[in-house]
């Protein structure tokens, strides 16, 4: 294991200083070592670890310390947002590293202004649903102010709402 990784995960390392209640987990350190070696050797790696192992930091720490560009794909938007808004900035600060990150999402995650205009103008894109017109009006008000068009900004609108295609 690279001594930098070992130091990061130790009882008095940067993670312990940055995270109240931090506890050293040998499994986490072992996973970080495996990830670090795979990154250094440019080899693929598949890792399985149980709940509470600390998988997120075990792959993020070696990725950040490698200095390489790394792509991290998540299974859920919730984890994606957690990494982008919380975990990566926290680790960058704890490790004293400048971190450049970008959040990439597919086009289904963004407002289509053309479809919104059609729905508002014709109403034909909306199935029969009580309250759909109010919901559409709310989306239209949001669309007038959003800078990104990221549908995640509409936190009070369920992903299963009938107004989404």
PLM regions: where:
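Residue-level marker of positions within ordered structural domains that often coincide
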Residues: 33, 64, 109
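The conserved Walker
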Residues: 51
């Amino acid at each position: 294991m690279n001594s930098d990784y070992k130091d990061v995960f130790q009882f008095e390392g940067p993670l312990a200083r940055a995270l109240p209640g931090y506890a050293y987990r040998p499994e986490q350190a072992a996973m970080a070592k495996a990830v670090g070696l795979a990154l250094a050797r440019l080899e693929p790696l598949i890792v399985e670890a149980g709940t509470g192992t600390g998988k997120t930091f075990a792959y993020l720490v070696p990725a950040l310390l490698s200095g390489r560009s790394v792509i991290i794909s998540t299974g859920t938007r919730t984890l994606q947002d957690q990494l982008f808004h919380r975990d990566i900035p926290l680790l960058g600060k704890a490790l004293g590293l400048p971190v450049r990150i970008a959040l990439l999402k597919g086009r289904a995650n963004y407002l289509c202004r053309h479809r919104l205009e059609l729905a508002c103008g014709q109403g034909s894109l909306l199935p029969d649903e009580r309250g759909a017109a109010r919901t559409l009006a709310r989306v239209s008000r949001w669309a007038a102010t959003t800078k990104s068009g990221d549908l995640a900004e509409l936190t009070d609108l369920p992903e299963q709402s009938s107004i989404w295609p």
